[in-house]
Amino acid sequence: MTAEPLEDPEASSSSTHDLPEASSDNTADENSADLPGESEGPDSLPDDVPPGDIDEVLAEHDVDQTSEAKAITTEQNEEQDFIRTDTFMRQDEDLLSKQISTITEKNVDQAYMQINTVFEQDKDQASIQTATLMGQDEDQAFLQIVTSVGQNKDQASIQTATLMGQDEDQASLQIATSVGQNKDQPSMQMDTSIGQDVEPAISTDTATSAVKDESPDIPHQGQDNPEETTSLLPQDPGILQVFVGFQNPVWDRLAENNRTSRSRTVSPSDSQTQEKTLGNPNVPEGQPVLVPNADVLSNLPEHVQTSVGAADPPPSDTSGRDPEPTPTTNSAKQEAEGFKALNPGSKARSPGLTSEDSAADSGIPPDPPDPGSPGGSPPHSPDFYQVALGRNLLDPNLYRPDVENDYMRSMTSLLGCGEGSISSLTDILVWSDTATRMGVAVGILASGCSSPADRLQDEGPRLRTVASLLRSARSAFSSGVMSGTGSALHSVTHLLESVERRTMEGIRSAMRYLAHHLTSRWARTGPSGN
């Protein structure tokens, strides 16, 4: 705006420069014409000019020269002033343009730097936010994957432990049940066979003791009062029933072999009984024979002999009376047959009971043993003497098998008792329960093992089957768990790959968007900066 008005002074100055040159030429011509030396003298004045007017002409000529000199001086001064003014104005314009260009460049640089700083900050913030979001997504995905994998592993381990525990519990229960059944069946069968073998001897002893229990003063007590004898029998028919257990041909053959071996053995007591029966031809076969007191005393133990001597009734009471055991024995047989008819499922027991058997059936404990007697034997009373007379001592040889072993030796010592006969079948049953289990002992005899350790170490077919089933089930379960774990890891790997791929795609798209956005803004701000 300041440059346009300055052009007119330059044009005027140029015109003025041109004008003084022309004017100077004119003035020079005039001066040269007016100079006195060069000008014409008075003689050269025109002829028509009067002499009086010469002074006036000279004066005018001087005035013209003076005015011209003044005009020249004025023009020179004006030209110098204009040149100075033009120089100053040009200097001011250059300085102003330089300052304006410097300020403009500074402003452009500052604006460009600010724009670049904002763009870089936006880029950094966007990249940081993108990286943060991607890191959060990756962390969340990894945590979720780890949590799901841990839960799957925990559930699989819990299910594995539960199934294994159930399998082990079921196997242990089955093994324990089978072992218990295998042990209980031989014990019940052995108890039954022992009871069947011992019961005839007990019935014979009780029948004989019933004959001997009769007092000499009352010869026909069994015939006159049969109800008193039957009152000693147990009223509950289920007491005498014996559980035969599960039938097994192996145990039946063992029982038959035992009975055969017993029947082959002949004891001294049997030979003495046969000789006494032959010596008394009037006594019918199958009935007990009364042994004289001397013979009985010779066969009884020492403490029984002393008690017999002390409790022997006087001979005056028994000299005129003969005992009649035959009617009493016949009545006892009739009562036994009647009891069998009433209880066909049970084995008949002899109606004649000893004092110990009646005490055992009624639940009354027997008399305590006398501490003064040797071996803890019961007190010597007439009842004990009569029971001793009525019982036949059991010979251990009858129960001795063909082949000796530890189990049968212990049974022989139990049956023999070292001093006298067994008291009842309860002793055998209690021994079979409290000892090392009758089933194990019979199993040892049947299998031919030398000791229980051999039988325990020998693994039966049922145990082997259960073990093989457990092994196969465990292998199948482990293979299933491994395959399930492999598939789970495979799916987790695929999930991680997909998450990583999506993350990289998101990063690329974000970078493309930022690059496109920033380049467009730079393209818009470029022309304005220039």
From Swiss-Prot:
The gene is Tex44. One of its GO terms (cellular component) is cytoplasm. This is Testis-expressed protein 44. The keyword Cytoplasm applies. Residues 1-10 have a biased composition (Acidic residues). It comes from the Eukaryota. Residues 1-85, 207-233, 256-290, 305-384 are annotated as: Disordered. It comes from Mus musculus (Mouse). Residues 11-26, 222-233, 257-280 have a biased composition (Polar residues). It holds the Pfam family DUF4678.
